[in-house]
Amino acid sequence: VESALPKVSSICYSVGEIRPIEALVALGMADQNTIESLAARGIQNFCEDCRPAHDMCTSCIAGTLAESGLQPADIGAVVLGHSMAKWDLKEEQAFLSALAAMGFSRSQIFGVSMQACTVANAALDLARLLVSSTSGPKNALVIIFGKDSEGNRLAPQAATLFSDGAVSCIVSPGSGTLEIVGAASLTDPALAALEWSEPNFPKYLVSGVMSLRKVCESVYAQGRISARDIAAVFATNGSSIYLQMIGSASGVADKQVYRENLPRYAHVYGCDNLIGMRDRMLAQDFKSGEYVISVAWAPNVASACLLRRV
């Protein structure tokens, strides 16, 4: 009997030009000590996309539609999640105009904000709620993206290195490769006023680990499983330290944490989890019934999304 749970399919992504971290020196963003620090944390490259954000998105959307065999007219809802420091009315209008140029017409269009780089899980959660509704759309298009707008890809204290990128997928009640079992998120508003500096790192870490554990426990309970049932963890590629922390908080064996894309791409704004799923399944598919978990962490937000291979 086919499961009634909403399913994810046709994940496509774009990361622009992949450049070695040494290029940051010529760009005036880093010195040699910073390069060595990034390398020690497992980061070798970063991604730079000179296109406007809406062009980054439409290239992914075109790939998702082609792979799924769907047309814009088949999409009943669009869920947009951005992980950008600057997103304004001009950007919003450019994105909507780009959708119209692709053939999208009157439909439900939602934007997910205040989730930072955990936005993909929130967007998947909203999309699954939409298509699960008795009067909801048959197919929802999810598009996640982020792009450097500040001229500095380094997080404070060089804790991570940000890359440009976009990723899209279809969420529908019909066919798909991964079904969405559950989702959860937590935001700690008390951290918003804290400066991201070394003296405050312990506060961020304590709160972050606590929130990560809670959201993982929540989705395990929703799926009536335990951490032992997880075949893979797809996490925020902040650094090797991020991956170790997220893996520990999820309760999953360290070897199950997907790490291959950290050296390849660094931290692609908001997109790491879905990009990892795509690449891992192309390289080595999961067995039917196996569970995977998408776990994301930003300084004051933690989220998790539990999925199962169809």
Question: Language-model features: where?
Answer:
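Claisen-condensing/thiolase-fold acyl-transfer catalytic domains that form or cleave C-C bonds
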Residues: 87-92, 105, 111-135, 231-310
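Flexible, glycine-rich active-site loops centered on histidine and acidic residues
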Residues: 134-163
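Conserved beta-ketoacyl condensing-enzyme motif
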Residues: 51-115, 225-243, 249
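Short, well-ordered amphipathic alpha-helical segments that serve as non-catalytic structural scaffolds
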Residues: 53-69, 206-223, 276-280
